[in-house]
Structure formats: C-alpha cells, structure tokens
Amino acid sequence: MTARLQEFYKEKVVAELIKQFGYKSVMEVPRITKITLNMGLGEAVNDKKVIEHATGDLTKIAGQKPVVTKARKAIAGFKIRQGYPIGTMVTLRGQRMYEFLDRFITVSLPRVRDFRGVSGRAFDGRGNYNIGVKEQIIFPEIEYDKIDALRGLNISITTTAKSDEEAKALLAAFKFPFRN
C-alpha cells in the first residue's frame, strides 16, 4: 500500500509541474528524494540522558531509529572533545518519507502557535528546503506529559529540482502552507 502523498504526486503533481514548466519527460519532473530530521543537542555534553530522551522523541516522530551524531573535532570553547555525542539525526526515504510529510503538513504545522505559514525563502539555491521547528510537541506522537524538555529540530527536504523556483512549485503542489 503506497502512501497517500505518493499517489497524489504520481496522479496530480507530476501533470501539474509538466504543464507549468514544460518538461519533455516524466523523469525530468522534480521529486523529493529524502527528508532529514536533525536535533542538535549542545546540552548533551553535561548530561548523557539528554541524548536518550532526544533519540526517543525522534524515533516516535520519524518511526525509525535515529543515529547519534558525534563531534568531528574538539572545541574547547564549547567544552566538547572529538567523538562526544552532540546530536541525533534520521533520514527518511520512500514510503516513510511521504507518510511523515503528510503528517507534517496536515497535522503538525497547524499545531504551531501563531502559525501563519512557512517562509518561502528558506531554499538553499539548489532546490532543497530547510525548516526549523522550535518545539517537538507539535507532533501528535509526542505526549506533552512525558517530555523532559522542549527541544527544536531541523527538517531538511532534499529534492531533485534544479532551482528554488521548481522546488517551491513542487512543495506548493503538495499543499505546503507558504506565507505570501
């Protein structure tokens, strides 16, 4: 059984983008290749339990076990040594990616306090989109009573689009709530 957004992409989005940009082949149409969720945890230097809690939260959000990211080099100013765990990240592809994107757009984003849409300027120039989430409690999988601290995370959506304009059209076709 394919994800709802994946079918929506094949049936509606592809045709819409071919009409808008005049692609000659279906394979030229931009698509989302992966979504990366990253949680940077600077406070993990002092408390090892922080990594466990964050990993648990990210597992619930993504439905997949994240990897713990370690410091590449020592930085005395931040009191970290090489190999210290400083974050956690998970990469979603395929069906899980589309299911996460569906939940994110329809359920999680509307739960953000004072939500007026996401910025249309957070593209990196190569057709990828980044969005920062200030609190992990916007996700319905996270129970408010069971969290130890409010943590933010970065969501990076990687596409095959050649330009920001194409990537924005792709995400807008997925009903991404962009600010005007």
UniProtKB/Swiss-Prot annotation:
PROSITE patterns: RIBOSOMAL_L5. InterPro entries: Ribosomal_uL5, Ribosomal_uL5_bac-type, Ribosomal_uL5_C, Ribosomal_uL5_CS, Ribosomal_uL5_dom_sf, Ribosomal_uL5_N. One of its GO terms (biological process) is translation. Signal peptide: none annotated. It comes from the Bacteria. GO terms for molecular function: rRNA binding; structural constituent of ribosome; tRNA binding. Keywords: Ribonucleoprotein, Ribosomal protein, RNA-binding, rRNA-binding, tRNA-binding. GO terms for cellular component: ribonucleoprotein complex; ribosome. It holds the Pfam family Ribosomal_L5. Part of the 50S ribosomal subunit; part of the 5S rRNA/L5/L18/L25 subcomplex. Contacts the 5S rRNA and the P site tRNA. Forms a bridge to the 30S subunit in the 70S ribosome. Belongs to the universal ribosomal protein uL5 family. This is one of the proteins that bind and probably mediate the attachment of the 5S RNA into the large ribosomal subunit, where it forms part of the central protuberance. In the 70S ribosome it contacts protein S13 of the 30S subunit (bridge B1b), connecting the 2 subunits; this bridge is implicated in subunit movement. Contacts the P site tRNA; the 5S rRNA and some of its associated proteins might help stabilize positioning of ribosome-bound tRNAs. PANTHER family: 60S RIBOSOMAL PROTEIN L11-RELATED (PTHR11994). This is Large ribosomal subunit protein uL5. The lineage of its organism: Bacteria, Pseudomonadati, Pseudomonadota, Betaproteobacteria, Burkholderiales.
